């Protein structure tokens, strides 16, 4: 039997929504000052929320695909949906990340280095160790290409992992008679 689900529309809609919500979440973190919080607990919480947003949209896309496919779904189909949704969102977030780090907050990487330096200083590192570490971080500032590719790769890998997990839970093979 052929698949009736409209793959392109499902992944495009959910990928665009995930990318848009991801940007809105990043703007919210920036506007509230939580982006540079320095609190480990807050950092963990914001990461968990970010992952939950991805799970929500990828699970929704997989369920829509399954519903459009007469209730049937293979793990491979779920992975395909998850990866494509993740890549579409990743492309959107990649453009935003480049815009953010070059126009909105061009001091982003220096702020990140300063935050890490504060945390390491609190752990008791010597001034010399801190200087060596921050100098190394500054030398390895990502290029625009790396800044662009990071969300794209993360989106694809995240979609792969989430698609596999969600697909394993929601799979329902067609009868082979």
Can you say where each PLM-predicted feature lies in the sequence?
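Short, charged juxtamembrane terminal tails flanking transmembrane helices
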Residues: 1-5, 170-177
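Transmembrane alpha-helical insertion/packing segments
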Residues: 1-61
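Alpha-helical transmembrane segments of multi-pass membrane proteins
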Residues: 9, 13-17, 80-89
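Alpha-helical transmembrane segments of multipass membrane proteins
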Residues: 21-29, 50-54, 89-93, 97, ...
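Membrane-helix interface/capping segments
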Residues: 60-77
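Functional transmembrane-helix hotspots
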Residues: 95-123
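Short membrane-interface loop/juxtamembrane segments of multi-pass integral membrane proteins
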Residues: 119-142
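Individual transmembrane alpha-helix segments
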Residues: 136-157
